[in-house]
Amino acid sequence: MIKGANGSGKTSLIRSICGFTELSEGHVKWNQLSIDDIDSSFQNEIAYLGHKNGLINEISAIDNITMNPNIVDLNELNDLVSGFNLDSVLDKPVEILSSGQAKKTALISLILSKRSVWIMDEPYANLDQASIEYLTHRMDLHTQSKGMIIRTSNQGDLSESPKLDIVLES
């Protein structure tokens, strides 16, 4: 987990880890190689959720989710929809969803991506307590399955997963 005050560089750091922006100092390595020296194929292992949810506002929540070609397990999709309590809004355009409902839609897409590395900027923002607990459970399942999670947070950590805290100071 990457911790730090607002403006300390948490978002900049995770965007650099993803290869979206360059670091002013230091290097990001993937399998012991600097990401500057390899092609972008390492990004195929990363599922990223930033402050913007990456959804298409004009289409429904379910259409956003099912655009993901990796969805093969409809039982898991149904479990996620139920776990995040999105059943009643699946057919609604994202533009009329609350920020929490849109965030849950984006989180379902991230979880269903089957990527080994989840990178999330403030994943608990805009979520109700039940959804925070459900997301924490899903993150624990991901790390128990040998997945890795890099995330920023201004809140406490509910996860049972092993972690390394990185604290940024301004």
Task: Name the predicted role of every residue range.
Residues 107, 146:
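Hydrophobic anchor residue at the start of the ABC signature
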Residues 75-90:
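Conserved ABC ATPase "signature" region
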